[in-house]
């Protein structure tokens, strides 16, 4: 409810001077969204593809480069430009070689490089701050003195200051570099010379990923106009005195240690398939062996399994299917490491 007897926080004179824009440092009116964000960003992409081959060998190569710039309205105030800047490089190379009329070897290699530069603060936090920061309590900055950026601010109570969204955005920088290499070698073998409808394939997959990260930051100095240091009768006069609001600012940039992380994934799979029709009888069978190792810490995660399927139908009307899986993981105790999982179904 409104208290009609309460003293207004802002006088009619204050509101008139703010609306007139007579002195944006004494009576600021900040559109924080316009200060922090642009109306548009750029995305650029280039792609080159090459494919060809003959009866024995087929190949495909692709190089894709993309660049995304962010909406942040930043300049190079420090040794960085911390507008969001993302570069992606992707290389794909596929080769298929027909070793014999019944044997095909394939190798697929994918390499990805990603570099991201940004403030060390999320866009979500910046949007939240522009919605919650008052536009009339302090200006974005005051005119620079001695090369120092003089961020505006004010005291909420005691020694607690407001958050200046522009300072929050400008005074930190982070860079992340990621590299991924994924290689798959696959062999397909037709075994019709043993019995018609029998095929086997195997593949080995090795994936490695690495990442490095570091950030830089500088502690900002916050100022406000000292009370009584300006002429109330000449508001267009820019002669005033600033007072420092915090003692923890710095003129020096600090940088974190470079953090590194990586992981490797190894997969091996053998697959034996059989499918054949005898008049109205359709018979199918599959036997699959798979193992996987994922390593990111000292101890790897390992999975191993054998699975199979047997199918039969008569005239595609009477159906039978049997499946089983015998799977294990090192994350369980030795006596519970493997389990058998059968399934049977009938249909008509």
Put a short name on every predicted segment.
Residues 20-31, 66-77, 157-169, 244-254, ...:
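Flexible, solvent-exposed coil segments and beta strand-coil junctions
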């Amino acid at each position: 409810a409104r208290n009609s007897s309460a003293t207004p926080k802002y006088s009619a004179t204050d509101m008139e001077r703010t609306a007139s824009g007579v002195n944006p440092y004494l009576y600021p009116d900040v559109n924080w969204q316009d200060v922090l964000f642009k109306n548009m960003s750029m995305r650029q992409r280039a792609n080159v593809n090459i494919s060809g081959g003959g009866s024995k060998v087929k190949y495909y190569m692709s190089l894709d480069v993309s660049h995304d710039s962010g909406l942040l309205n930043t300049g190079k105030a420090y040794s960085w430009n911390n507008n969001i800047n993302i570069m992606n490089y992707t290389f794909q190379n596929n080769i298929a070689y027909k070793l014999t009329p019944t044997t095909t070897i394939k190798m697929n290699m994918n390499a990805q490089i990603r570099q991201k530069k940004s403030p060390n603060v999320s866009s979500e936090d910046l949007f939240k701050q522009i919605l919650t920061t008052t536009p009339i309590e302090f200006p974005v900055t005051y005119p620079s003195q001695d090369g120092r950026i003089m961020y505006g601010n004010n005291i909420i109570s005691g020694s607690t200051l407001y958050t200046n969204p522009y300072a929050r955005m400008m005074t930190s920088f982070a860079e992340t570099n990621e590299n991924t290499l994924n290689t798959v070698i696959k062999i397909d073998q037709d075994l019709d010379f043993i019995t018609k409808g029998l095929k086997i394939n195997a593949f080995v997959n090795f994936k490695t990923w690495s990442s490095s990260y570091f950030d830089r930051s500088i502690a900002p100095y916050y100022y406000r106009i000292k009370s009584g240091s300006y002429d109330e009768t000449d508001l267009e006069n820019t002669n005033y005195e600033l007072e420092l609001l915090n003692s923890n600012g710095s003129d020096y940039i600090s940088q974190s240690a470079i953090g590194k992380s990586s992981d490797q994934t190894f997969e091996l799979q053998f697959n034996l398939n059989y499918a054949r029709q005898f008049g109205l009888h359709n018979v199918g069978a599959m036997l699959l062996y798979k193992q996987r190792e994922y390593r990111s810490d000292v101890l790897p995660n390992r999975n191993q399994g054998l699975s199979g399927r047997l199918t039969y139908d008569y005239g595609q009307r009477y159906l039978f299917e049997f499946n089983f899986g015998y799977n294990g993981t090192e994350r369980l105790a030795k006596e519970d490491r493997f389990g058998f999982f059968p399934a049977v179904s009938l249909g008509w």
